[in-house]
């Protein structure tokens, strides 16, 4: 992998394979040391990066990564403490847009989680299709410790994965929990040695680099619709996507067409 694309200016990079190996593999890299704390600017850059990755025809699968040391410690609390109620509402909207943008990337996505995934960092990881964690990672829905609650659809995503009782306990307490518990709760899908996190995520993503892009995008959107649409609307959307994918395959475009909504 090579060639950082400087389309997002400061804290979030899009890194796309140069084609020498793993053609089609890309990375959305959080880069705000030391903890990848999330500010309004970081969220805006996440939106821009996710949208770019969704559009690019040279991208087939995406790794969401915060680097070797830490995924994200969540929201930047010093910034939050300076906000008025109106500004906090705007910040919550931007946070939601970032999480939604990652979830809407019409390609397989995997979060490679190192160090800590706390608060909004955990929510962002839950927006990926698959999550690989180091066995030393600490997780937490920690917003309550600052007198807040998860936003960015964080409580819904946590509840879908862990169930309502477990989600309430985690949110009410804000406690840290380890990767083994995260795996048991269904919040992560694989647990590996800390030095193997990125490689394990890349191995998962490689499985789909040669897949039919239009069909993968349609399948991803259809599964997401299970939680988002009423049954009749969901079934109609599924049927529409099936016909679109069928037509793309008939036209010989199964590899070249990208999209799904």
Swiss-Prot record:
InterPro entries in the record: ClpP/crotonase-like_dom_sf (IPR029045), Enoyl-CoA_hydra/iso (IPR001753), Enoyl-CoA_hydra_C (IPR014748)
Described purpose of this protein according to its UniProt entry: Could possibly oxidize fatty acids using specific components.
Site label Important for catalytic activity, positions: 143
EC top class, as a word: lyase
PANTHER family: (7AS)-7A-METHYL-1,5-DIOXO-2,3,5,6,7,7A-HEXAHYDRO-1H-INDENE-CARBOXYL-COA HYDROLASE, ENOYL-COA HYDRATASE-RELATED
GO cellular component labels: plasma membrane
Sequence similarity: Belongs to the enoyl-CoA hydratase/isomerase family.
EC number: 4.2.1.17
SS bond partners: none
Statement: the UniProt record of this protein carries the keyword DNA repair: no
GO molecular function: enoyl-CoA hydratase activity
Gene giving rise to this polypeptide: echA17
Protein name: Probable enoyl-CoA hydratase EchA17
Lyase as UniProt keyword: yes
Top-level taxonomic group: Bacteria
Pfam family, one: ECH_1
NCBIfam families in alphabetical order: PRK05869.1
Catalysed reactions, as listed in the record: a (3S)-3-hydroxyacyl-CoA = a (2E)-enoyl-CoA + H2O; a 4-saturated-(3S)-3-hydroxyacyl-CoA = a (3E)-enoyl-CoA + H2O
GO biological process, one term: fatty acid beta-oxidation
Keywords from the UniProt entry: Fatty acid metabolism, Lipid metabolism, Lyase
């Amino acid at each position: 992998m090579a060639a950082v694309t400087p389309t997002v200016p400061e804290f979030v990079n899009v890194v796309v394979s140069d084609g020498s190996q793993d053609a089609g593999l890309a990375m959305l890299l959080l880069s705000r040391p030391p903890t990848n704390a999330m500010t309004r600017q970081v969220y805006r850059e996440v939106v821009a990066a996710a949208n770019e990755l969704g559009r690019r025809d040279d991208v087939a699968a995406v790794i969401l990564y915060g680097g070797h040391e830490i995924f994200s410690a969540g929201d930047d609390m010093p910034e939050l403490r300076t906000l008025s109620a109106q500004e906090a509402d705007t910040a919550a909207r931007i946070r939601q847009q970032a999480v939604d943008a990652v979830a809407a990337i019409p390609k397989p996505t995997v979060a490679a989680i190192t160090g800590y995934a706390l608060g909004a960092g955990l929510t962002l990881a839950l927006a990926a299709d698959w999550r690989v964690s180091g066995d030393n990672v600490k997780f937490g829905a920690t917003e309550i410790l600052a007198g807040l609650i998860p936003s960015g659809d964080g409580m819904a995503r946590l509840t879908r994965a862990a169930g309502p009782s477990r989600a309430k306990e985690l949110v009410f307490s804000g406690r840290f929990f380890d990767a083994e518990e995260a795996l048991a709760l269904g919040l992560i899908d694989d647990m590996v040695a800390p030095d193997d996190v990125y490689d394990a995520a890349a191995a998962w993503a490689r499985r789909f680099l040669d897949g039919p892009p239009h069909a993968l995008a349609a399948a991803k959107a259809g599964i997401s619709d299970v939680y988002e649409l009423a049954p009749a609307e969901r079934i109609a959307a599924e049927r529409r996507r099936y016909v679109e994918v069928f037509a793309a395959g008939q036209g010989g475009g199964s590899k070249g067409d990208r999209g799904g909504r």
